[in-house]
């Protein structure tokens, strides 16, 4: 148990409700204090439920704390069974019920003889387990409870393990993976937990292969199905060119299908991905830029691979999944200058500030930190804001997800640079006509400082050294004149006879602080 005002991972309750709430005809009774009803709000707001979410709170109040809460729980379970008529009722423990040492299994055994629904108590530790561990354990528990031997489908088919409500773009990812598999000639037998029923769980064994889409949870259920029913599985989060191609090849090998033409089709020189990665625009905007990555295991690893593939330098990559530290180090070794595991958001915030990256890829908390320090940011992992639960298709996985992410990274870096420069040096005076704009562009070009061997400093004039000249040429033309004038004014006021890189950086810091003071 950890006392904190920000946690990257949710509680065990969050994990259990993500699994149970994603299924059909499954109702969850939460045995805890009034505050644990937050789960209903999350589903209503983030997933935009048009019906009441399938959660009922068996409230532990002052009376229950003094006299015991068993009677309240029994009454709640009976009411849920009569009113909602689910196939399964999940009685989930909370920290409060654990403190009261309530024997929920005994309640389930007694009530199970009186209810039509099957009663299940998740085998998790409400104090110790966090969201993804609870998801993994509970998903394995219900698969073990309901999966039965079934004949295989005639067509090669797979089960998709992992997509659920409240996951980061997971429902969009599910549709993209379905589309990819359909293009390869592979059928989807079942998806769990999203949209799954008891019948779905019973028919899992019809599939020839299980695909665990996220490393954080689901692999234990795949292991169970392999040991008990002999179903092979792969664990893959296909983000980026290399990981997506490996994913497609792994499916092709197990299905006995040719997949090379499909990969070539998506990576063809005339295709969107190849045209973007090899374009002058991409090379000038992305190549050599400095990025930092932080998130859950799957998305942090995938995004690090993707950034390296497009020429972006990853200064550091981190994850908050402390239990997966060794695997994380092995998956990113050599792709980032520094690889680490940390769940302290303040430490990550300070690390972002000290690194001064061109772009931040992280969670909602890193978005706040990046905004505080004026760095462009993309949210690539949960925990996320409602903005990252879009109505329009926005996958992260597969070739379509890669295309979307490339577009997002490119535009974020460009717009972030423009805003940063304008904030530093200001905009030119308003009211300038098209003719004046063209004349200023010509003037800026003609006024560009030359290399030091071709420039002499007269009275009142400043000489720019070669490095400073090169740096100025890299500034976009629409603010280049302002940058040059402000830098030279700064240098003259302080008695410099030559503009160097150090002078440029000092001027940058001066005007940036001046701009921030003006905003305040």
From Swiss-Prot:
Biological process annotations from GO: light-independent bacteriochlorophyll biosynthetic process; photosynthesis, dark reaction
Record pathway: Porphyrin-containing compound metabolism; bacteriochlorophyll biosynthesis (light-independent)
Key words of the record: 4Fe-4S, ATP-binding, Bacteriochlorophyll biosynthesis, Chlorophyll biosynthesis, Iron, Iron-sulfur, Metal-binding, Nucleotide-binding, Oxidoreductase, Photosynthesis
Annotated cofactor note: Binds 1 [4Fe-4S] cluster per heterodimer. The cluster is bound at the heterodimer interface by residues from both subunits.
Keyword Acetylation (UniProt): no
Organism: Heliobacterium mobile (Heliobacillus mobilis)
Active site: 281 (proton donor)
Broad class of enzyme this protein falls into: oxidoreductase
Protein's name in the database: Light-independent protochlorophyllide reductase subunit B
Molecular-function GO terms, alphabetical: 4 iron, 4 sulfur cluster binding; ATP binding; metal ion binding; oxidoreductase activity, acting on iron-sulfur proteins as donors; oxidoreductase activity, acting on the CH-CH group of donors, iron-sulfur protein as acceptor
UniProt: substrate binding residues: 416-417
Role according to the record: Component of the dark-operative protochlorophyllide reductase (DPOR) that uses Mg-ATP and reduced ferredoxin to reduce ring D of protochlorophyllide (Pchlide) to form chlorophyllide a (Chlide). This reaction is light-independent. The NB-protein (BchN-BchB) is the catalytic component of the complex.
Catalytic reaction equation(s): chlorophyllide a + oxidized 2[4Fe-4S]-[ferredoxin] + 2 ADP + 2 phosphate = protochlorophyllide a + reduced 2[4Fe-4S]-[ferredoxin] + 2 ATP + 2 H2O
Family membership: Belongs to the ChlB/BchB/BchZ family.
UniProt keyword Transcription regulation, yes or no: no
Pfam families attached to this UniProt entry: Oxidored_nitro, PCP_red
Annotated region (Disordered), positions in chain: 429-457
Subunit-level organization: Protochlorophyllide reductase is composed of three subunits; BchL, BchN and BchB. Forms a heterotetramer of two BchB and two BchN subunits.
UniProt-annotated binding residues for [4Fe-4S] cluster: 36
Cofactor(s) recorded in Swiss-Prot or TrEMBL: [4Fe-4S] cluster
EC number: 1.3.7.7
